[in-house]
Amino acid sequence: RGGVEQGFYSDMKSDEDWMFGRGWFGRYYEPAIMDYRSDIETGYLALVLRGGLFYLVPYVAILILSFFNGYFRSRNLFCKSFAILCLMQVVNLYPYGWPAFNFYHFVVWVGVWVCNSKKFRRLDNIQIAEYCF
């Protein structure tokens, strides 16, 4: 994967590429295969390719804020579990973890909602069980 990342870094030369990315269908030149690629295996670089730092930074900030709210400001295991899932998504951005339209990422964004909702954070474990189940 190191060669793929090096190809990405060498092709993303301008500040505009890093700030705004190359769009949803953006591509970068990969010297190892002598062709342009539209995806990269590393999650945070995939976000940079699509929308630049203006896409990556808010994405990570929302997930980290959700982790802190859900883990440290909640009174129940429901929020704490979603908070850990949000943190795992941030950690997972390095080895792979780029956003996709699938059930896992749907659950992550439900977790963002739950962790940032005072309504859920104020409930204790018994109230969560009554409310959800």
Feature map (PLM): residue ranges:
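Membrane-interface micro-motifs in multi-pass membrane enzymes
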Residues: I40-G43, V48-Y55, P95-H105
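Hydrophobic, Leu/Ile/Phe/Ala-enriched alpha-helical segments that form helix-helix packing faces
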Residues: F8-M12, G70-Y71, V110-V112
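Long extracytoplasmic/lumenal interhelical loops at the membrane interface
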Residues: R1-G51
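Alpha-helix termini
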Residues: M34-Y36, L65, V110
